[in-house]
């Protein structure tokens, strides 16, 4: 595939595809995670199975297993094998610390879960510093419905990650993506929402034609995306509670690549209503447009700097797709990518330090990371035909679409490149990922 063909896929999809939208409900199909590589330098941590007193009525979720999987996926921590745990304590006074020090782990998680009279669950957890022989975190949750047990496990994972790294965890967050399946020989597309680990997948719309470019609002309550339900590209705004859906851009020509401003007051768009494909900003309260770029080249895939003062976007104004930065106060436009003949799909880390992008090279199209402080540029992946990088809200991971064995899947790579994971569905292909914000 040539560089130009890769670049033109976006425009081609916008121009020629049609879209048919309908609500639907189907059995959920969670993403399956395969961890390709784990760091040998990961810190061991003991995650003790939570105490459960009734062997004949086990809770529907194994909290310790979920928490261990969360921390393992970070690449920073390695849960000790369950078979090697010297005991199953659930209280501080039950811990024989010499046994745990011999295990080589400095920290351990213990806890209990009980079913109450309402049929819900009471949970207690304690995070222990083994060397100091003291509890550093202790918390209880009461009357938790079964459907929220996984969420409690992710909250515990976030607490442990913050305690151990000083960085807020991002396990209790959501991701959006598009799944493509074959139904009666025809392609069917669905926009789905899932937990950050791919579980609890919920489709929010279904189409016989592609769905593109989902973008989360900063409060995590709405998605903007591109649809073709009326035979042309249109940008749709939809609330995740199902109460609101409306078309917000249906101009002549291309309507694509929506991206929310950090304060949620504006949406950056790619429009060709004035001839060429350029970047515009829509005021979400008034609907008024502000044109940011004026160039005959294709200008698209914009994303906001965290301070809201500039936009990063993809343009072939220099003959090949590269990443540029437009400063909204001065109008200055500056090229920022110089390594390689092809760079597209910019995504900015939450702290504004890094720009992830797709770099075209002899090995295909890979996720690359540009450090705006040092200008260090490095390839992050060894996969093929990567697309749509998206940072986790804590900036520690990058979610992206890739191709493996001829099938589109999602993958996650840690910012330090110590671990990668592949997320796939058994009955389809997954693409166009977008990592949502913190929910509280």
Model-inferred region functions:
Residues 31, 92-159:
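Amphipathic beta-strand/beta-sheet edge segments enriched in Tyr/Trp
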Residues 32-98, 109, 113:
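Short beta-strand->alpha-helix linker/helix-N-cap micro-motif
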Residues 119-122, 184-192, 232-236, 276-280, ...:
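Structural motif
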Residues 169-171, 218-219, 262-263, 306-307, ...:
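Residue-level detector of Asp-centered blade-edge/turn motifs that repeat once per structural unit
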Residues 175, 223, 264-268, 308-312, ...:
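Hydrophobic beta-strand positions that form the internal "hydrophobic ladder"
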Residues 195-210, 238-256, 282-300, 326-342, ...:
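Multi-bladed beta-propeller domains
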């Amino acid at each position: 595939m040539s560089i130009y063909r890769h670049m033109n896929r976006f425009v081609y999809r916008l121009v020629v595809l049609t879209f048919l939208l309908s609500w639907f409900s189907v059995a959920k199909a969670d993403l399956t995670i395969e961890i390709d590589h784990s760091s040998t330098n990961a810190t061991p941590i003991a995650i003790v199975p939570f105490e459960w007193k009734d062997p004949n009525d086990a809770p529907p979720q194994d909290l310790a297993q979920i928490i261990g999987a969360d921390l393992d996926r970070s690449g920073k921590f390695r849960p000790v094998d369950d078979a090697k745990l010297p005991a199953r304590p659930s209280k501080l006074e039950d811990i024989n610390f010499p046994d745990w020090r011999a295990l080589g782990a400095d920290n351990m998680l213990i806890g209990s879960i009980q079913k109450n009279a309402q049929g819900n669950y009471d949970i207690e957890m304690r995070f222990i510093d083994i060397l100091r022989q003291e509890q550093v975190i202790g918390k209880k949750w009461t009357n938790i419905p079964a459907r929220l047990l996984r969420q409690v496990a992710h909250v515990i994972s976030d607490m442990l990650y913050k305690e151990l790294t000083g960085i807020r965890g991002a396990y209790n967050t959501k991701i959006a993506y598009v799944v493509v399946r074959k139904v009666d020989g025809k392609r069917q597309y669905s926009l789905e929402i899932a937990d950050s680990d791919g579980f609890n997948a919920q489709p929010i719309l279904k189409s016989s034609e592609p769905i593109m470019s989902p973008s989360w609002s900063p409060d995590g309550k709405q998605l903007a995306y591109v649809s073709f339900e009326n035979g042309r590209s249109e940008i749709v705004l939809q609330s995740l509670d199902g109460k609101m859906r409306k078309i917000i851009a249906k101009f002549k020509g291309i309507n694509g690549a929506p991206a929310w401003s950090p304060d949620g007051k504006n949406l950056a768009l790619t429009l060709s209503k004035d001839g060429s494909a350029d970047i515009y900003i829509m005021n979400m309260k008034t609907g008024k447009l502000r044109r940011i770029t004026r160039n005959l080249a294709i200008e698209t895939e914009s994303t906001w700097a965290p301070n809201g003062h500039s936009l990063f976007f993809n343009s072939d104004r220099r003959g090949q797709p590269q990443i540029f930065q437009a400063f909204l106060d001065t109008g200055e436009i500056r090229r920022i990518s110089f390594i390689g003949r092809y760079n597209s799909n910019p995504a900015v880390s939450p702290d504004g330090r890094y720009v992830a992008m797709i770099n075209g090279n002899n090995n295909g199209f890979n996720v690359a990371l540009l450090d705006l402080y040092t200008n260090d540029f490095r390839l992050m992946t060894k996969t093929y035909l990567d697309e749509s990088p998206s940072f986790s809200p804590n900036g520690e991971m990058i979610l992206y679409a890739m191709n493996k064995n001829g099938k589109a899947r999602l993958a996650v790579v840690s910012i330090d490149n110590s671990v990668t994971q592949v997320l796939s569905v058994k009955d389809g292909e997954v693409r166009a990922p977008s990592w949502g914000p913190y929910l509280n």
